[in-house]
Regions:
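Bateman (tandem CBS) regulatory domains
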Residues: 248, 330-345, 397-408
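Short glycine-/small-residue motifs
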Residues: 379-380, 439-444
């Protein structure tokens, strides 16, 4: 049983590790997620935010009544907001305009003053979120600018807490640690600690296209041609933060914006983990290099933050489609029935005369009907089978149960259109979707329309 805490800051850390099951079924070894959204600010950044503040207090750089100023993707700002509230400081955050509206709204809700700055400018441009924070720090008396990128308390926080937790939770069996890299604090702090326990542990960093990390790690060259705008939030950089200890990192893998977004949604559907954008990128990067793993390995992937910060982005179908991330092939059963989910399913019983089924088909302009018996699916009929029966038995005395075929397959709302199309291609005229207490039907024509 947990104790009673004196304040919210005391709940930071000691986050759970959760085995990934369905989404990692093709891996040769177990994969465990260190889920950092269980921190009070819903991200891993709570750890280092508190560490930076407490260090500044100890050094006398942050004095009572002072102002904390930080450039952030949102999560560090939230951690600093918690510290500012408990300790009595004012907080000003600068964010780039690519960050989600939810992040900005959350910071303001926590009492922070927020400056939104353009993304597509150089780091030293006066309007960049780095430069604006620097300017405010110079202009505002008694202010403290942690600058998480170069503040080594960032990685020290993970060396002191996150790393030991992972080692203890896996009982020292961890062989690979995988995490998205932004400021570099998490991978460097955790990596240093784990390699001190076992030098053979591999540390893999996940990068994004438009970032400099991977090429710099491989060539030791800072290539500005690697820098271009990207959508992924929380990982990748156009600078080399001092917190990134490239000697600790064994390998970098890059992930596209699209693949990271799709993996984020997949983790929610398959594992019940409602995660942030970079978490999907971290898992996708691991999945891309799973062939490097063996059955004897134990992998830990760290998931940075919570999905509530991305409701209007990766979890919004319109946002995904506008960026080409959610093609027709990524639709699921729910998308196909949305237009007619309010309509009742047309059915017949197996004891009805075939003429009743023919009348319903004509009335509703349909070509197939599920057959029910006491509320249970027992079969199906379609216009082809009906025509054959009418030709062979003109008296129309045939009952539905005498000519019905097998019941249509039943899927859930999250079944992909690709899987449904395969069922229809394999000979089924339609598929039923479980919807609340009843069902809805997806026909061959519905699929053709969705894919066209």
């Amino acid at each position: 049983m947990r104790p009673i805490y004196d304040n919210i800051l005391q709940t930071i850390g000691d986050t759970p590790m959760i085995k990934l099951n369905k989404i990692a079924k093709d891996f040769p070894c177990p994969v465990y997620a260190k889920v950092e959204y269980f921190n009070p600010g819903h991200s891993v950044k709570d750890r280092m935010a508190l560490k930076m503040v407490e260090d500044a207090e100890a050094r006398g750089e942050l004095k009572p009544g002072g102002t904390i100023i930080e450039c952030t993707s949102g999560n560090t700002g939230m951690g600093l907001a918690l510290a500012a509230i408990v300790k009595g400081y004012k907080l000003i955050c600068t964010l780039s305009d690519k960050q989600s509206k939810e992040k900005i709204d959350i910071l303001r809700a926590m009492g922070a003053e927020v400056y939104v700055c353009p993304t597509n400018v150089a780091p030293d441009h006066p309007e960049s979120y780095y430069s604006v924070a620097t300017r405010l720090n110079k202009e505002i008396p008694n202010s403290f600018y942690p600058f998480q990128y170069d503040n080594l308390n960032n990685r020290l926080a993970h060396y002191e807490s996150t790393g030991p937790e992972i080692w203890e939770q896996t009982k020292g069996k961890v062989t690979h640690f995988v995490v998205g890299v932004g400021t570099g604090g998490t991978i460097s702090g955790v990596g240093k600690y784990l390699k001190e326990q076992n030098p053979g542990i591999k540390i893999w960093g996940i990068d994004t296209y438009g970032s400099v990390f991977k090429k710099y790690h491989e060539t030791k060259q800072f290539d500005e041609k690697e820098i271009y705008s990207y959508i992924t939030e929380g990982i990748g950089e156009d600078i080399l933060p001092k917190n990134v200890d490239f000697d600790v990192i064994d390998f970098f893998e890059k992930v596209t914006d699209k693949d990271g977004a799709l993996a984020t949604r997949e983790l929610a559907r398959k594992e019940g983990l409602f995660l942030g954008y970079s978490c999907g990128s971290a898992f996708q990067g691991l999945r891309q290099i799973k062939d490097k793993l063996t059955k004897d390995d134990v992998v830990v992937v760290l998931f940075h933050d919570h999905g509530s910060r991305y409701i209007g982005k990766v979890y919004n179908d319109d946002w995904m489609r506008d960026r080409g991330f959610l093609s027709q092939g990524n639709k699921v059963a729910k998308d196909l029935i949305d237009g007619h989910s309010h309509l009742p399913l047309i059915t017949v019983t197996d004891t009805e005369p075939l003429s009743n089924a023919a009348r319903l088909m004509k009335l509703h302009d349909i070509t197939q009907i599920p057959v029910m018996q006491n509320g249970i699916l027992v079969g199906s009929i379609d216009d082809h089978g009906m025509l054959s029966s009418m030709v062979d038995n003109p008296s129309n005395s045939t009952l539905v149960g005498e000519i019905m075929g097998a019941p249509y397959p039943v899927v859930d709302l999250t079944t992909s259109i690709d899987d449904i199309a395969k069922m229809v291609k394999d000979g089924h005229r339609a598929v039923l979707v479980k919807f609340g207490e009843g069902h809805h039907i997806i026909t061959k024509q519905d699929i053709i329309t969705a894919l066209s």
